[in-house]
Amino acid sequence: MEESKTPHVAIIPSPGMGHLIPLVEFAKRLVHLHGLTVTFVIAGEGPPSKAQRTVLDSLPSSISSVFLPPVDLTDLSSSTRIESRISLTVTRSNPELRKVFDSFVEGGRLPTALVVDLFGTDAFDVAVEFHVPPYIFYPTTANVLSFFLHLPKLDETVSCEFRELTEPLMLPGCVPVAGKDFLDPAQDRKDDAYKWLLHNTKRYKEAEGILVNTFFELEPNAIKALQEPGLDKPPVYPVGPLVNIGKQEAKQTEESECLKWLDNQPLGSVLYVSFGSGGTLTCEQLNELALGLADSEQRFLWVIRSPSGIANSSYFDSHSQTDPLTFLPPGFLERTKKRGFVIPFWAPQAQVLAHPSTGGFLTHCGWNSTLESVVSGIPLIAWPLYAEQKMNAVLLSEDIRAALRPRAGDDGLVRREEVARVVKGLMEGEEGKGVRNKMKELKEAACRVLKDDGTSTKALSLVALKWKAHKKELEQNGNH
């Protein structure tokens, strides 16, 4: 069979578009640079979403997809946290994954590697049964990866809740992080989400390598520390920034309208405001943000979602039913119509960030969004909401110094005065100049590392060569 001569890699993304998108970029590089074939094995608790299908259907023919039957999570309560749901989806998909691997064997296409992402380590069981080397694609920072690798030890040595720690956690090469800023599933050690986080991190040592979506100039000290050989520490390969910077088609007139509006604004004058496809604010915080943007007197393009009490409430359903514009303060649209453009739900983000009129990005610090900003050289206002975003915000504002971070009051609310101060500071102030210059440097570095002789390209080549060597070995042993 002709195809069996080409190394074949199976990739299992955790549920959620934020996990799929960087893996798609990773797969494209494997195909374009190394001539590999890739199969995405998609697990989920329902039928594939339209967004998933659109992304997967647009890929080159050497990247195919298999959709596993939905898993049954009806035994979980409505309060079950997202990390538990994601982990259980992968774990309960193992019987179906075995069938897919059987079909690979029958077709002479046994993968030379299985790649999972951060919560998918239970799929290693299937990889081991079929003698396929397991790898992890880690879609966030080297700093958070260091935390994941250290968590089993931390769990044994700390008895209190991490938020009660009086000293910040100091990991080699990493920015010090207070316990209250640890990622969400580490905030309640009695919750199943923490147990699943711990369960997955304990299995990281079983991987034959970890590919991380970052690059040396962005996190030099953390990457150096991770690459020092150590017990229970697989080799780490920084292969980022893997982001989709190709042209997204603005699907509706409203979406292309926002780009037309940007065309008419002065160079670098617009603050782009978006909390990602999963992030929402409370009613009160939405109100304060709106009034702060108005008071700042800066130009802005705001992707708005209806408020809710849960920061990641639209993680699986990015179009809540209510019109978000009805939640804006009275008179806000009229007051800001000359300077602001408000768009519900979604904007073509890569195009907005690459637009010459965009000069800043108020972001939830999701890592995909952060890397898109780095690639376009756009300085940040860090406004973390959920997952590991607080850890990212600390890294971006205190270590990399590519972001300003507004201060919240004791009640967790960022007041309008603080919003206005930070927005003005980024777009007009001295502080803004510093982060702008830093982002310019990082943009150039991001471009360099992905060139043919760049560090991230070389790191990916090392892994691809390993996989090709494994394929040759299998052929010599007469095993397809």
Swiss-Prot record:
CDD domains: GT1_Gtf-like (cd03784). Changing residue 117 to A: Loss of activity. Disruption phenotype: No visible phenotype under normal growth condition. Its EC number is 2.4.1.-, 2.4.1.218. Changing residue 19 to A: Loss of activity. UDP binds at residues 277, 346-347, 364, 368-369, 372, 386. Pfam families: UDPGT. One of its GO terms (biological process) is xenobiotic metabolic process. The keyword Transmembrane helix does not apply. UDP-alpha-D-glucose binds at residues 277, 346-347, 364, 367-369, 372, 386, 388-389. It comes from the Eukaryota. Keywords: Detoxification, Glycosyltransferase, Transferase. PROSITE patterns: UDPGT (PS00375). GO terms for molecular function: hydroquinone glucosyltransferase activity; UDP-glucosyltransferase activity; UDP-glycosyltransferase activity. PANTHER family: GLYCOSYLTRANSFERASE (PTHR48046:SF6), UDP-GLYCOSYLTRANSFERASE 72E1 (PTHR48046). Bifunctional O-glycosyltransferase and N-glycosyltransferase that can detoxify xenobiotics. Possesses high activity to metabolize the persistent pollutants 2,4,5-trichlorophenol (TCP) and 3,4-dichloroaniline (DCA). Also active on benzoates and benzoate derivatives in vitro. Belongs to the UDP-glycosyltransferase family. This is UDP-glycosyltransferase 72B1. The lineage of its organism: Eukaryota, Viridiplantae, Streptophyta, Embryophyta, Tracheophyta.
